[in-house]
């Protein structure tokens, strides 16, 4: 279900991160995922969204590909709106935590296919939720 250039860029970022990520960046991802988990308890959607952005930014920076990072940054505002809608659904939070853990695991092991698959699932879940929100608002 993934669609759009942003999805393509994110998949590329995950694949490059599998090749280039450092031990320090893996530790940063783990810390960002833990911070995200803690911030979820605050129910402050802005803080939660910013914590999620920090997690994904570590992946993007790990690519060491300035052009790709720039392209993803250009899409940041559009992606942020969708992210906020998704993060408002508290029932999705346990799944997000699990997906972040799986992304860390597969990137740290350099398992490109598994990392890409989980990132696609992560994106698809967000897209599906946003579509549901739009449909609900229309009715």
For each of these PLM feature ranges, what is it?
Residues 1-6:
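Single conserved hydrophobic/aromatic residue that forms the stacking wall/gate
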Residues 20-85, 98-106, 114-125:
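Conserved amphipathic alpha-helical segments that form helical-bundle/coiled-coil interaction surfaces
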Residues 91-94:
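Active-site loop of classical SDR/Rossmann-like NAD(P)-dependent oxidoreductases
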Residues 124-133:
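Short arginine-rich
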Residues 135-139:
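…primarily DNA-binding HTH/wHTH and HhH modules…
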């Amino acid at each position: 279900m993934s669609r759009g250039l942003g999805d393509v860029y994110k998949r590329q970022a995950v694949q490059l991160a599998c090749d280039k990520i450092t031990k320090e960046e893996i530790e940063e991802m783990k810390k960002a995922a833990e911070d995200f988990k803690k911030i979820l308890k605050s129910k402050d959607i802005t803080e939660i969204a910013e914590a999620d952005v920090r997690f994904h930014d570590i992946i993007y920076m790990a690519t060491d590909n300035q052009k790709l990072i720039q392209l993803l940054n250009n899409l940041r505002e559009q992606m942020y709106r969708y992210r906020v809608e998704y993060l408002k659904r508290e029932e999705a939070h346990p799944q997000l935590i699990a997906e972040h853990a799986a992304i860390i695991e597969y990137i740290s092991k350099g398992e490109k296919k598994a990392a890409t698959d989980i990132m696609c699932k992560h994106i698809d879940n967000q897209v599906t939720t946003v579509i549901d929100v739009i449909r609900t608002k229309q009715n």
